[in-house]
Amino acid sequence: MINLEILRRILSDQIKTKQDLHREKIRLCKKHSLKKIPPDSKILENLPNSLTAEEKKKVLNLLRKKPVRSLSGVAVVAVMTSPAKCPHGKCIPCPGGIETNTPQSYTGYEPAAMRAKNNNYDPYLQTVNRIDQLRAIGHSTDKIDFIVMGGTFTARDFYYQEWFIKRCYDGMNRCESGSLEEAKKINENAKSRCIGLTIETRPDWCRMQHIDRILQYGATRIELGVQTVYDDVLYKMGRGHTVLDSILATRLAKDSGLKVCYHMMVGLPGSDIKKDLESFKIIFQDPRFKPDMIKIYPTLVIKGTKLYEMWKSGEYEALTEEELIPLIAKIKSFVPEWVRIQRIERDIPSPRIEAGAKKSNLRQIVKKWMEENGMQCRCIRCREVGHVDPEEEVDPADVELKRIDYEASEGKEIFLSLEHNELDAIVGYLRLRLPGRPHREELQDGGTIVRELKVVGRALPIGERAKEGAQHKGFGESLLKEAERISKEEFDCEKIFVLSGVGAKNYYRKLGYTDDGVYMRKDLT
């Protein structure tokens, strides 16, 4: 009864904002003597089939919880592996581990860790439950950006790795498959398609054999725990790898077509604000690094870690929020336009943090500080049209193609972007690479490789079009055509490859690409 009354008021424009909605819920609960206010997900569950597409969209736009989760064009689903030791031991700041029944480097109280624990670390159940949660709060889950978290995945037993990934695909497919290859094949046409698969690991566990294995799983991105570009800081934190490991892992991954995301830390023992700033300048300017994406993690003091003991004894002092905010702002101010800042700070509940950044909205605080101090971040995420203006109607006539060329990891990179000049917003982008020293057999005869193609804005179901937003308007195809032109005319290449997510392969097939090993290929002759 109450759900239908709310629905009628939304459709008649009597409820226009979240505040209107909350007030109306309270009024109706009092009117009907209800003790509990219904969540938005319950209203969404009971939408009548008689609603038109426009009416449904109007309701979804108001009731969708945390709309930012799908403003980049996809729905993110993160799952965690079961607790296991890291091969090198344990870093000084690192919480978690098998003794606490949590994956290494997690407290067990992060939302993803709690979902994993509640589902007994079963990848199928984690996947199904997370997709159902996202659907229940109004998000499209046709296109899934899938992330495997929880320690050093590439160091796990091979059988566990393959079983885990297969179960993730089975969860997206909602059916049991006989093998990993079968699960991947089913996913090409599934309701929830894996358009990207991310694996988290350490730089010293990202060699050729590790890359070959994750490519076989359908991986499109690797996240490396680089942390810093100073060997003395890595040694002091007990990291167990060197800067050279990060350089090698970056080149091998890029030359295989993978997108590369760095996890970078500030405030580590042995570092300082000046050193932290320099560390970020180096990764953006030194061609041996140049990641496509970064996550910025302030060092946190958590009980049970070696760092906690150092902090208690006065041997270590954490950066305060007053120090962190301008530091991160300065970092953001020089991030290149071809880099996306994926995340700022860990998802750890503040009561678990003894010292360090405790505010959960650090990104928003930094943004406000930058605005007040006349600073701007030009990273991809800050300029994605979905974050700048999610309701903007993007007309192809208002969009301009831009290009940035740079050298990275012994290869040539071209970053193509379609940008809305009036909004100063990115509509879509593509990363094209001419590899330096690829080890993959498919790439031995030359050719360029598209490492990323993405159209941003609110995620739309596959096949659906919308007047507003940027998705499904041919932007991806136009970027791909320009990449093909550059490959043929400027690099004299006879073929172009794409490292596609399993669930995006049909898109490339429609554009003339065929399967070639783990890649999609198009002959340009």
Segment roles from a protein language model:
Residues M1-Q126, R130-E176, E337:
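Flexible, acidic/Gly-rich N-terminal and inter-domain linker regions that tether
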Residues Y109-Q126, F146, G150-C261, M265-E322, ...:
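Conserved non-cysteine loop/helix-boundary elements of the Radical SAM core domain that shape
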Residues Y316-R431, P435-R437:
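C-terminal accessory regions of radical SAM enzymes
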Residues E419-Q471:
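Conserved acyl-donor/pantetheine-binding loop and adjacent beta-alpha core of acyl/acetyltransferases
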Residues A466-I486:
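Conserved acetyl-CoA-binding loop-helix of GNAT-fold acetyltransferases
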Residues I486-S500:
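Conserved GNAT acetyl-CoA-binding A-motif
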Residues S500-Y519:
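Conserved active-site alpha-helix within GNAT-family acetyltransferase domains
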